[in-house]
């Protein structure tokens, strides 16, 4: 599992006083991707869905949690949730990520001069 504590500020506002759904979804995507990578699976998003239950207030700490549910060949299925510290659920997400060839990432790194390292991967 991977966790992230997030506080959405005024620049992430959608409805008055609440976070924009796109900002909420972007964190889900990033966290599910990070969950793959820190577990040794260099993967990219194929698709994800977000289900919203209630608006997320601005300027309040919320907690994201993501976990890998299944690995089938090069397909990695994940689930995630967004709650507050009293356990109130704001949203959930499901994602499908595709395992990538780390050598191709390294080649792209050299070609673009991005200077990205992958110390957590053993491949």
Where are the predicted features?
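Glycine-centered flexibility sites
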Residues: 14-17, 21-22, 33, 59
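Hydrophobic beta-strand-centered segment that forms part of the acyl-chain substrate-binding groove
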Residues: 30-65, 90
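Catalytic strand-loop segment that frames the active site of acyl-thioester-processing enzymes
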Residues: 1-19
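Charged, low-complexity, helix/coiled-coil-prone segments
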Residues: 4-9, 23, 105-113
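Non-catalytic surface loops within mature trypsin-like serine protease
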Residues: 8-10, 54, 99-101
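Mid-length scaffold segments of soluble, non-membrane domains
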Residues: 24-28
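HotDog/MaoC-like acyl-thioester-processing domains
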Residues: 57-58, 69-123
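A structural signal for short, well-ordered beta-strand segments
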Residues: 4, 48-52, 66, 80, ...
């Amino acid at each position: 599992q991977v966790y992230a504590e997030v506080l959405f500020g005024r620049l992430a506002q959608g409805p008055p006083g609440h976070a924009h759904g796109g900002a909420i979804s972007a964190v889900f995507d990033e966290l599910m991707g990070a969950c793959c990578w820190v577990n040794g699976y260099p993967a990219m998003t194929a698709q994800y869905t977000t289900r919203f239950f209630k608006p997320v207030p601005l300027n309040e700490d919320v907690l994201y949690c993501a976990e890998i549910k299944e690995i089938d060949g090069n397909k990695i299925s994940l689930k995630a949730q967004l709650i507050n510290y009293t356990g109130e659920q704001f949203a959930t997400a499901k994602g499908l990520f595709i395992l990538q060839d780390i050598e191709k990432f390294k080649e792209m790194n050299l070609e673009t001069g991005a200077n990205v390292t992958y110390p957590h991967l053993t491949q």
